Amino acid sequence: MLPRIFGNAKANGGTGKFKDITPEVLEELKELNITHIWYTGIIKHSTAGERGVKGTAGSPYAINDYYDVNHYLASRKSSRMKEFEALVERTAQAGMGTIIDFVPNHVACDYVGTQAPFTDENYYPGKTFDGDWSDTAKLNYTSHDTWVKMRDILLFWASKGIAGFRCDMIELVTVDFWKWAIPQIKEQYPGIIFIGEAYQPENYWNYFNIGGFDYLYDKSGFYDTLRRIVRGEDSASSITRQWQQLGDFQPKMLNFLENHDEDRIPSEYFASSPFKALSALFVSLFYNTAPFMIYAGQEFGVGPEKTSIFDFCSLEPLRRWNKGVKESDSQKYLHYEESDLYAIYKAFCDIAVNDPVICKGDTFDLQYANFENGNYNHHRQFSFLRHYEGTVYLCVANFEDHRVDVEINIPQHAFDYYGIQPDETLNPNERIKVSIEKNAGTILRIK
């Protein structure tokens, strides 16, 4: 979430504050089974009137003082850091961890830095970027002084009690820096997590096994594939190829259907309706044990416009939701479809976090056993088994815009793999009949 947007009660202008993320707000988020909150736009960035700034607020990724927080988020400028620390503490008391951004590749063109300021040796020759990143200057990692300063920045924020860092555009920084820095942070702060924004699957091995990252974005795999399937531009069976390419990295990939860089689900460039992507949500949450990220407002169907991270603005459904939270009824001012969508997200997240078969079990892809199945469209349905301690679920997603009645083959290999003894009702020769609503999914316990 961007606190300046999340807590903003004004339709035009204005900004949310640290204080708007109250214990009551956090309790509601915890009800959605959230484990960590990624607070975006915390560290001080360039704002309107400064060199090359985008929008009315500026980009959270054009940082101009790595040892400060944004003044506009505080009720009192002089107490801004204490207010952030109080937010971290409130979040922890609510049973969740705080994630903040670490932007290693670049800083704002007007970077000042109240501590350990950057000098010419810390910048790449040419300094400023062209095009979309024209408000930033690239850091020079051929200088070891840059490594030291960036490590010290990580240590500074880790000392605030945060649970982890979401690291921006990690592939633009040498993996050797991460190999050097991450173990030093983890030595002093065991348990702190590093999430990397990465887009090239061929680099995953290096950033996991050499760089030391705990999780990487799964944008180029599951996200891109599921988006194409929802739009009717790819086969549901393409999901198989994605998990096969990931291999053992599957549990370490961060799944999502929205973030600040991508279109909102209701956009015409994605699903056109938040309900049309529920089959993609089903697969993202239930296919494996990987973590899943929800972008603030996604659970209410915010959109179709992409939410600006560069402006002082607000989101109407979040304004109404926050108003309801203040009156001890978070659903009070939500529209019917928003409440309905939220209930679905909550039910899905309850299963994903609390059902041991889903949150701990392993997976058996059934697509290959149903390619020749005349009662199953492998281009528009996707099926798999989840297994844990003798319990087996059959999970089937339907990407069609209408309800379907399908029959699923479970091959002998699955019975052997899970040690299931066939019987009259469950065996490789009998297909299992399943009814699935449009753009949805079904879970059946079969053992």
Residue ranges and their predicted role:
Residues 428-447:
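C-terminal beta-strand-rich structural cap/linker in extracellular carbohydrate-active enzymes
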Residues 410-425:
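Solvent-exposed beta-hairpin/edge-strand motifs
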Residues 37-39, 98-100, 165, 194-196, ...:
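Hydrophobic faces of well-ordered beta-strands that scaffold small-molecule active sites
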Residues 152-155, 163-164, 168-256, 268-274, ...:
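Active-site-proximal helices and loops of the catalytic beta/alpha 8
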Residues 395-400:
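Asparagine-centered strand-capping/turn motif at beta-strand->loop junctions
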Residues 281-303:
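Substrate-binding cleft of secreted/luminal carbohydrate-active enzymes
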Residues 2-160, 181-189, 203-205:
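Substrate-binding/active-site clefts of carbohydrate-active enzymes
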